[in-house]
Amino acid sequence: FPTDGSETATEAAVHAIDLADRHDADIHVLYVVDHERVSQMAPKLGTDHIKETLQEEGETATSEIADRAAAAGLETTTSIREGAPADVITSYAETVNADAIVMGTNGRTGMDRLLLGSVAERVIQTTDVPVTTVKSPADEETEE
């Protein structure tokens, strides 16, 4: 289960925990320190500071999900990696022989989607592991 600490990732965590509980599976919680995000912010704040801040974000995000999973009686492994998110997620899932990937979608539309793409979309296109995506609560409200 990849997380970025967002509301969408938290919603996806609920689904991941439920799925793991129903199938007596363990949960791997992954946070990726995005190199692109680091390089965009580095000129203003410095690479080391950015990486440290994102590492702390990752520790908070993964521990919150791990605590929820543990409360449901699930074994949990947390990991923080650096790189391009879609590549890291795909590689990690293959390395741990994941049965599934559950992740949120960020709901990018228009020019943002064209320029930035979708991590979930890239994961789906590049992995053989089944992927379940969970829409952001904001996306669901927009559809109503």
Task: List each model region and its residues.
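Small/aliphatic-rich secondary-structure junction motif
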Residues: F1-A42
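Short, well-ordered secondary-structure micro-motifs
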Residues: A12-A13, S39-P43, T90-S91, R113-L115, ...
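Short, solvent-exposed amphipathic alpha-helices that sit
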Residues: H15, T53-I65, V88
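A structural signal for isolated positions on well-ordered beta-strands in alpha/beta enzyme cores
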Residues: D26-H28, T77-S79, T132
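Acidic, proline/glycine-rich short linear motifs
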Residues: V33-E57, E143-E144
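Structural beta-alpha unit
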Residues: D67-I101, A138-E144
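Gly/Ser-rich helix-loop-strand patches that form or flank binding pockets
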Residues: T95-E144
